[in-house]
């Protein structure tokens, strides 16, 4: 499994926004510079995250972005799946390759193995949330 560059940038952008004081907006320029993400690419990512319900956008000269919900309620899995779609670790788990790994000897054991591994990874990513960065960032700014 390899995380896409787009997901990596999205995770970094959300991490950045989670460290800001609750009433402060993050501008595209500020996030782009702080996280070293190309501005044009970041704009598309932030739009996707806004459509996905993770961010709120505010127009105008003083506009920007902020989290739409508490950082503790935004998981890494949520961000990855908004950006890249459902997380899949193998052809065996996407529902399109039914029986792809099956043979008469293993009776789907290989397919079951990959499905179990996918559950482990998804559970781990769903337990990782941005609240941990929010606390750290706000502590460092005081």
Feature annotation, model-predicted:
Residues 10-22:
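Short amphipathic alpha-helical interface segments
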Residues 14, 46-47:
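Short, hydrophobic-biased segments on the C-terminal half of alpha helices
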Residues 26-36:
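A short alpha-helical element within helix-turn-helix/winged-helix DNA-binding domains
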Residues 33, 50-51:
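Alpha-helical residues within the helix-turn-helix
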Residues 40:
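Key DNA-contact positions within bacterial/archaeal DNA-binding proteins
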Residues 53-62, 66-68:
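Beta-hairpin "wing" of winged helix-turn-helix
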Residues 68-142:
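Non-DNA-binding regulatory cores of transcription-related proteins
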